[in-house]
């Protein structure tokens, strides 16, 4: 059994290596056309889907203290695409043999609560999410104090959000450098959120 397991693991590693080669080739092709890899991603977090609810964190609670360097929060440190890794299960082909591929991403945080204090050394400290490049946060609450000792982008729900935050509540103390806000230090789309915060300058 051990020899079969070793063979299987070796085969899976070889497949992973080949996927990385293909990804590098596609990146090179994109660079030749002048297109950015980020242009190939579509955020579908705000769309209702009929399939299984993947890409979702729901009903999580934190009561412990969280300390870190960057992208620090009570529930999720970062909602972002890591371009160094291969996205899984979301490649959509157009046509029979197309290199015109698109990735769809979904990242949802729903009905989560943070009661623990959050301290980041640098940018992006939030009660629920530190850095939110994409996705949706809804029906979340934060009651823990949020601070950045040497950075900015501090918020009761998110340090910075380019996604959507809606129907969320905040009651806490906030402190840091630039860009401090009750819901988000920097926020793109904020809907029906409520705050009762004290901001230290």
Task: Report the location of each language-model feature.
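Surface-exposed loop/turn motifs in large extracellular/passenger domains
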Residues: 1-201
């Amino acid at each position: 059994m051990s020899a079969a397991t070793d063979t299987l693991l070796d085969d899976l590693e070889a497949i992973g290596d080949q996927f990385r080669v293909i990804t590098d080739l596609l990146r090179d092709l994109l660079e030749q056309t002048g297109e950015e890899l980020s242009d190939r991603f579509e955020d579908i977090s705000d769309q209702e889907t009929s399939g299984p609810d993947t890409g979702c964190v729901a009903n999580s609670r934190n009561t412990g203290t969280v300390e870190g360097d960057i992208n620090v929060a009570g529930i999720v440190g970062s909602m972002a695409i890591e371009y160094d890794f291969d996205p899984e299960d979301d490649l959509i082909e157009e046509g029979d043999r197309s290199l015109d591929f698109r990735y769809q991403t979904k990242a949802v945080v729903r009905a989560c609560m943070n009661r623990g204090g959050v301290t980041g050394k640098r940018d992006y400290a939030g009660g629920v999410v530190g850095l939110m490049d994409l996705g949706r946060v809804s029906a979340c609450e934060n009651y823990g104090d949020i601070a950045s000792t040497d950075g900015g982008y501090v918020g009761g729900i998110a340090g910075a959000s380019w996604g959507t935050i809606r129907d969320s509540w905040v009651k806490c103390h906030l402190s840091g450098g630039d860009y401090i806000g009750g819901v988000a230090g920097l926020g793109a789309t904020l809907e029906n959120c409520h705050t009762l915060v004290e901001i230290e300058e």
